[in-house]
Each structure stands twice: as C-alpha cells, then as structure tokens.
C-alpha cells in the first residue's frame, strides 16, 4: 500500500513555514535539509520538519495540502503545537551518520 505525506517545515526561527506533499518523506526532508531543491525552502532556509500527516490516498493528501496552504498562520501554529509544542525537528535523527569503532 502506498503512503503519502503532508508536511510542514520551518526555518530555525519558526517565522517561515512551508507546506508540501510527498510519497517519500525521508527523501523529501533530506532534499530540503541538503538544499537540493531550488525555490522557496532553499531561499528561506526551511529545513526543520515540525509536523506531518500520513495518507493512503494521494487525492486526500493533495486536498489536505491545499487546505493547509489556505490556513491562517495562527491555525498552522496551533496544529503544529498540538503534537509538537517545542517545535522540535521530527527528522533530527533520521540522517545521523554512524561511524564504526576503530
């Protein structure tokens, strides 16, 4: 079964948010963190995953993304803070490098 994700990323000051949709959240967040994607998120340094939702239907995911993009900033803040009150980077440990002991 395919999975789709709607996500919100922020810059380190939490004053810029970006909402997106993807079928591979780890890959997409990695692309944002490494600045592999040109455009808004690269320009405003949005690379901190602060919220995401999972869907089994791409159409529902796209509808949710569109809905969130039309929300007021306060509504998005409330959504994020409901599950992530400290605005932690939910992907912080996804890309840690491990080194073998010598």
Which residues are covered by each model-predicted region?
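C2H2-type zinc-finger recognition helix
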Residues: 58
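Short, surface-exposed polybasic/aromatic micro-patch for ligand or macromolecular engagement
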Residues: 55
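GIY-YIG nuclease catalytic motif and its immediate N-terminal context
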Residues: 1-38, 42-52, 62-66, 83-85, ...
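Short arginine-rich
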Residues: 66-80
């Amino acid at each position: 079964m395919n999975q789709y994700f709607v996500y919100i990323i922020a810059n380190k000051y939490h004053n810029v948010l970006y909402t997106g949709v993807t079928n591979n959240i780890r890959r997409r967040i990695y692309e944002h963190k490494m600045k592999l994607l040109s455009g808004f998120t690269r320009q405003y340094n949005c690379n901190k995953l602060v919220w995401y939702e999972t869907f089994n239907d791409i159409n529902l995911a796209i509808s949710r993304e569109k809905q969130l993009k039309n929300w007021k900033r306060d509504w998005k803040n409330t959504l994020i803070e409901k599950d992530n009150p400290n605005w932690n980077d939910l992907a912080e440990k996804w890309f840690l490098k491990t080194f073998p002991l010598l």
